[in-house]
Amino acid sequence: MIAIIDYGMGNVGSIKNMIAKIGFDAIITNDPELISKATKLILPGVGSFDSGMTNLKELGLIDILNKKVVQEKTPLLGICLGMHLLTNSSEEGRLKGLGFINAKTVKFKLSNKFKIPHMGWNYVKFSIKNKLSDNLIENSRFYFVHSYYVICEDKKNILMTTEYENEFTSAVSKDNIYGVQFHPEKSHKFGMKLMENFIKQA
């Protein structure tokens, strides 16, 4: 069972629709009991770091996420804010993140030539190849909307990078844990292939 975690921070319906187009069923839930039965977890999100962590805590989801992801090694895909919440902390807020990836979330500091947020289509380069990036071509294009990005303490966790004045990490990977800065559900064939990889192989 694929569980899309609904904690009030994103358009979960569009992710469910993409998964259906690939040929799989997913549930949208914030019920810890249903999440405990899932074989794949997706943590989407748009909004602020502290609001995301607060909502997860108030819904009683942090303990079940720790059990599923850390103890049971259930594959997890964090999307946009969901990727940020996998880290230890964010410049955007004061609360601690889930800490699944040894990393921090920081705000873009760019020249006037580059607008914040980084919005629109951009290319990714693969730092490593693994199950999530399988059969994706070099310089695949994805859709981004973000003002913050992730800095990994361990460079081995960097899966993809993207150029926006400077190079930044656009996807992370550690064992059963994956995070993408872009929105697969808005990225057409590239997003569908990545989501299919996560569901079938990760």
Swiss-Prot record:
Cellular compartment(s): Cytoplasm
Domain of life: Archaea
Biological-process GO terms, alphabetical: L-histidine biosynthetic process
Keyword Cytoplasm: yes
GO CC annotations on file: cytoplasm
Catalytic activity: 5-[(5-phospho-1-deoxy-D-ribulos-1-ylimino)methylamino]-1-(5-phospho-beta-D-ribosyl)imidazole-4-carboxamide + L-glutamine = D-erythro-1-(imidazol-4-yl)glycerol 3-phosphate + 5-amino-1-(5-phospho-beta-D-ribosyl)imidazole-4-carboxamide + L-glutamate + H(+); L-glutamine + H2O = L-glutamate + NH4(+)
Subunit relationships: Heterodimer of HisH and HisF.
PANTHER family on file: IMIDAZOLE GLYCEROL PHOSPHATE SYNTHASE SUBUNIT HISH
Protein purpose: IGPS catalyzes the conversion of PRFAR and glutamine to IGP, AICAR and glutamate. The HisH subunit provides the glutamine amidotransferase activity that produces the ammonia necessary to HisF for the synthesis of IGP and AICAR.
Name of this protein: Imidazole glycerol phosphate synthase subunit HisH 2
Organism classification: Archaea, Methanobacteriati, Methanobacteriota, Methanomada group, Methanococci
